[in-house]
Amino acid sequence: MQQLTIAIDAMGGDFGPQVTVPAAVQALSQFPELKITVIGDRDAISTQLTHLNYIPNSRFSIVHSESVIGNNTQPSKALRHSRGSSMRMAIDMVANKEADACISAGNTGALMGLSRFTLKLLPGVERPALISPLPTKNNQRTWMLDLGANVSCDAETLFQFAVMGSELAEQTLKRKAKVALLNIGEEEIKGNDQIKRCAEMLNQCQDIEFIGYIEGDKLYQGIADVVVCDGFVGNVCLKTSEGVAHLFLDQLKSHLITSKFKQFIAKWLFGDVISCLKGLNPDQYNGASLIGLRGIVVKSHGSADVSAFNNAIKEAVHEVKRQIPNRISDRLEAVLLERHY
């Protein structure tokens, strides 16, 4: 059984150790091969362990950090003053081969900047990207990138995102991934110059199964396995989708589950429907990967609860086992060779 170690920024996110520590303990029971190092305020972490009646052992270790990078800290400032912070120390563990992956629910811009500075980019990669799965019909999923790491992207960067996203998705799908560019229409004449140029590049690439443009209303139809866009569009799209999903689920709860009797009736009459709707809960897909780096970094939502943060840990374990950075590097090299010849 492959042993693996994950470093967790225990102080990141809205709830810090109240979420990260229970999620880490839960993950240890799910993965016997897993070791976890939580980094943060030792007293705050120990308090949560006491609440859980959990005694640290050889699979759970604590590393004390002196500071936390705030949610409003500018990436440039985070780079200058990050030493001793829980986020920087978690990334450093990956860089120093002391951990196979790291997870943080902290400041996204700081995480991207520190990861890029510390871990460096894979050969040939211009920019890293945030990628995460979205639910689609028939209980399938579509991977979308970029989700906010890069506000604007040129055609070459979008092309690289398509290659990297394909490789990540195919490690789960076990087949060729269908790739689409998010656009304001499906016709070839639609879109800005970057999107049009990227479409030309993808059409010429035999290694990628490019199916053309896709509009926002088709994202959840399962038409494409990978959807590519710049980080501004991707982040707005993701946050809007999550907001609608939460609104729908909250409305469902308020109308159907106001008493034990109504809960019973709802479960009896609409059990399958309710189970299906729970699949829309964004918490199930928490854990966006920062791909294109020489190491594995997973970004959790800042508002994640224990279950959601646990899903981010699962994503990190998945990527370690499949050696995602190495596979992406090999795929990019193969595509570059194809384009050269």
Curated annotation (Swiss-Prot):
Location within or outside the cell: Cytoplasm
Alphabetical UniProt keywords: Cytoplasm, Lipid biosynthesis, Lipid metabolism, Phospholipid biosynthesis, Phospholipid metabolism, Transferase
GO molecular function annotations of the record: phosphate:acyl-[acyl carrier protein] acyltransferase activity
Function: Catalyzes the reversible formation of acyl-phosphate (acyl-PO(4)) from acyl-[acyl-carrier-protein] (acyl-ACP). This enzyme utilizes acyl-ACP as fatty acyl donor, but not acyl-CoA.
Catalytic reactions on record: a fatty acyl-[ACP] + phosphate = an acyl phosphate + holo-[ACP]
GO cellular component, one term: cytoplasm
Domain of life: Bacteria
NCBIfam families: plsX
Uppermost EC category: transferase
Record-given protein name: Phosphate acyltransferase
